[in-house]
């Protein structure tokens, strides 16, 4: 009995010691990002998650600007927000691939306190079937476009004085945490945001700017409906292991994470497991979450291997079935 008590006491002391150490070393510290009376600028804000985030920001008293390519969709988004809240938002039409156009829109909108880089495009195909133009399109919009938006906004965001902590958020995807069949180019464009966010946080933390990386799962947006029709069958089978969520649910979780100044924001348990499995050198502002990563990282790696085993078994069965169907047609 004494041995069991000693082991238990050692475990408790170990956890307490680890918590004390982590409370000193986790960086950057989490802060609360104020929203009321502040300027929130959202790219890809005319539909889907971006529009839902705009609704939330307006409802919490922010001055909101949204940017997208389509003037028609921007007008619809502006009307929907005004009907729901009675507040008028500013709209800007620009292609994020065009740095000059983005820079002009951001300059016209005024100094930004909370920047949400949300634009994204997806063309689901195996790489062999994807054209170089399609690959370039996704990389240019999802990754290069994010660089353009942030670079254009940074000078004024850094020049802010006495306005409290600021935020730059990038909307990635669970495909930016784990590569998925049929998402070759898309995953590459979203994985790139991880490196962008990690390095950017180091560059802007001394200016009081906190970076947040958002990892939504499949979300029932208009774009997702089109994606389901076009993406490979095997992609849908594998992606189903994570499940999907409603747009407003995702927007609430993401917006709460932005306000809490978190670096990594996930939307459900599978996403949380993926965040720990892929955390690498990501900053962690919460010593409680840091403790979870340290204590359970190995077990979560085991869980990720189980997922990989399931995915590869699925690919193997699907491939064998397809070969049989092809052979039967040729016979």
Swiss-Prot record:
Q: Which amino acid positions bind NADPH, per UniProt? A: 44, 46-48, 69, 73, 95
Regions that span the bilayer: 8-28, 263-283, 287-307
EC assignment: 1.1.1.102
For the biological process aspect of GO, one term held by this record is:
3-keto-sphinganine metabolic process
Q: Which InterPro entries match?
A: KDSR-like, NAD(P)-bd_dom_sf, Sc_DH/Rdtase_CS, SDR_fam
Give the tissue specificity.
Expressed in roots, leaves, stems and flowers.
Catalysed reaction(s) here are: sphinganine + NADP(+) = 3-oxosphinganine + NADPH + H(+)
Per the annotation, the residue ranges of the short sequence motif GXSXG are 44-48
Q: Where is the active site?
A: 172, 186, 190
Instruction: State the UniProt keywords alphabetically.
Output: Endoplasmic reticulum, Lipid metabolism, Membrane, NADP, Nucleotide-binding, Oxidoreductase, Sphingolipid metabolism, Transmembrane, Transmembrane helix
* Protein name as catalogued: 3-dehydrosphinganine reductase TSC10B
Write down the species.
Answer: Arabidopsis thaliana
